[in-house]
């Protein structure tokens, strides 16, 4: 299991992922990053966060519990192209005994522009019982540390948005 005894990285507010590269195979016939691969980048970034809080791949193997995404709202704001280097920020907006609510931003690493956002609700799941489960105390503690750090950040303007098409008068 990952050694999470040093909580220092949890205090990064927001968490910033490692740099990732837009792969050539991810480009669609419009010449830019296909919408599905934005989620690959967001998912890889959240895997880094999950390792920090102790619910990564090794956690699933050791404890038979994992995280499932229950809902996601993605906004595509600016195109990315093959070879672009990107990074993702992660802000924990809230959590309870079984759920995480977080907001991610995908930025071009060199130019800094915001390319996409993704707001997510994730569930902690016991794979044997096939239902949600309480976070164990060690994970709950790390989540509390992260949330305390992230609570100092302003809430993203786009958090809580919904899709709508207002009717013209």
Predicted features along the sequence, with ranges:
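HotDog/MaoC-like acyl-thioester-processing domains
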Residues: 1-18, 80-85, 92-169
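A positional/architectural concept
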Residues: 15-32, 36, 40-43, 63
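Residue-level recognition of the GNAT/N-acetyltransferase active site
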Residues: 23, 77, 108
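A broad, structural micro-motif
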Residues: 33, 67-69, 115
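Hydrophobic beta-strand-centered segment that forms part of the acyl-chain substrate-binding groove
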Residues: 49-100
């Amino acid at each position: 299991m990952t050694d999470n005894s040093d909580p220092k990285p949890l205090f990064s507010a927001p968490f910033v992922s490692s740099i990732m590269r837009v792969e050539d195979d991810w480009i669609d016939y419009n010449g830019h990053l296909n919408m599905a691969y934005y989620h690959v980048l967001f998912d890889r970034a959240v895997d880094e966060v999950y390792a920090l809080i102790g619910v990564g791949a090794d956690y699933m193997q050791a404890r038979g519990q994992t995280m499932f995404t229950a809902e996601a709202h993605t906004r595509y704001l600016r195109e990315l192209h093959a070879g672009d280097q990107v990074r993702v920020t992660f802000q924990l907006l809230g959590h309870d005994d079984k759920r995480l609510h977080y907001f991610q931003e995908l930025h071009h690493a060199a130019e800094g522009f915001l390319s996409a956002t993704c707001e997510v609700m994730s569930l902690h799941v016991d794979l044997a019982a096939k239902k949600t489960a309480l976070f164990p105390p060690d994970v709950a503690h790390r989540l509390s540390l992260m949330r305390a750090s992230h609570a100092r950040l302003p809430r993203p303007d786009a958090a809580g948005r919904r899709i709508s098409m207002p009717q013209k008068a």
